[in-house]
From Swiss-Prot:
Protein name as annotated: Putative GEM-like protein 8
Annotated source species: Arabidopsis thaliana
Residues annotated as domain GRAM: 96-174
Xref: Pfam families: GRAM (PF02893)
Family membership: Belongs to the GEM family.
InterPro entries: GEM-like (IPR037848), GRAM (IPR004182), PH-like_dom_sf (IPR011993)
Domain of life: Eukaryota
Amino acid sequence: MTLSRVHQQLITFPAVKTSPAGYLPDPASINKLQIPTSSKFSFLTGKGKSMLRKKKNDSFTNGVRDQDKLGPKLTETVKRKLSLGARILQMGGLEKIYKRLFKVSDEEKLFKAYQCYLSTTAGPIAGLLFISSKKIAFCSERSIKVASPQGELNRVHYKVSIPLCKINGVNQSQNTTKPSQKYLEVVTVDGFDFWFMGFLSYQKAFNCLEQALSLSFKQ
């Protein structure tokens, strides 16, 4: 994928040691991937390759491929649910986690957060999908290795932030041969698509996002 100058903007990589597991590392160790309302993209790249996927005809195929990879991991996800809940309570709840991970406006309200996977060109990434009155935001559960501009490998948490006003549509899909494999495709006005899968509460996540978008359009 050839990237334009606008699309090649990089957030500063941290030089500090980061935690390999769990949410809420030192904020300085979190790498941000955001879609600001100006329609310009800032995103994370590693070894010259973007982890974002431009909308292509094979996007659904890639999503199915990633879902197939999750077969043995879904059981692990369920097992992690209790430990994640304990960590959330320990850190003061989802609201505090959300405000620490992302920039939140005074009038913004967090609706829900759902465990899922985000499909990337590097494979599916486990994390939390936050849905608020202003945006959807994803943060990886574990840190990942990326190359800094100096060529050094650092561990950072992978984050995506998409304002609701930049979402062009949300599509529900499922594997026809494996109906239990369901996906949420979020398409932006700029033509990028994001595939979320492996939800513990798929329909609830879709309904919450649908309601958030409906409320956003009325404002």
